[in-house]
Amino acid sequence: MADNRTFTMIKPDAVENGHIGGILDQITASGFRIVALKLTQMTQRDAETFYAVHNERPFFGELVEFMTRGPIVAAILEKDNAVEDFRTLIGATNPEDAAEGTIRKKYAKSIGENAVHGSDSDENAQIEGAFHFAGREMF
C-alpha cells in the first residue's frame, strides 16, 4: 500500500560527516523497515530532474551543486503511516527549528545542509523511490 512506504536520501553533508550509520540506526529504531538501499552519486542531470519542482526558485542552482558534490544514500522505507511518521522523525527543514531528538536536530548543519530528504506525500514517495530504484531493487 502506498501509505506504507516513503523515500529518503541521506544527503552529501551527512555522508561526508560519517552519519550514515547513526541516521540508519535512528530510522530502524523508529520502526521503519528498509526495503531498498544504495550508496550512489547524483549527476547534475539527476539532481536537476529530481528537484525540477524547485527549478524556478532562487536556491535551485545551489541545491543541485550541493546534491552532486558527493555520494548520497537513497532508501525506501516501510512502516504504517510512513510519510507522516518519517517527516516527524526527520524534523523541520531548518535544524534550528527541529524538535530535539530528530534527525535534522542531531545531524544537520543548516537549512541548506539539512542531512536528509523525506518525501512529502505518498504520491511523491512513489515517484522519488522509482527515480532511484528499479522494481527488482525493492524488497
UniProtKB/Swiss-Prot annotation:
Gene Ontology molecular function, alphabetical: ATP binding; metal ion binding; nucleoside diphosphate kinase activity
EC number of the protein: 2.7.4.6
Compartment(s) of residence: Cytoplasm
Alphabetically ordered keywords of this record: ATP-binding, Cytoplasm, Kinase, Magnesium, Metal-binding, Nucleotide metabolism, Nucleotide-binding, Phosphoprotein, Transferase
Family (UniProt): Belongs to the NDK family.
Subunit structure: Homotetramer.
Functional note: Major role in the synthesis of nucleoside triphosphates other than ATP. The ATP gamma phosphate is transferred to the NDP beta phosphate via a ping-pong mechanism, using a phosphorylated active-site intermediate.
Protein name stated in the entry: Nucleoside diphosphate kinase
Lineage of origin: Bacteria, Pseudomonadati, Bacteroidota, Flavobacteriia, Flavobacteriales
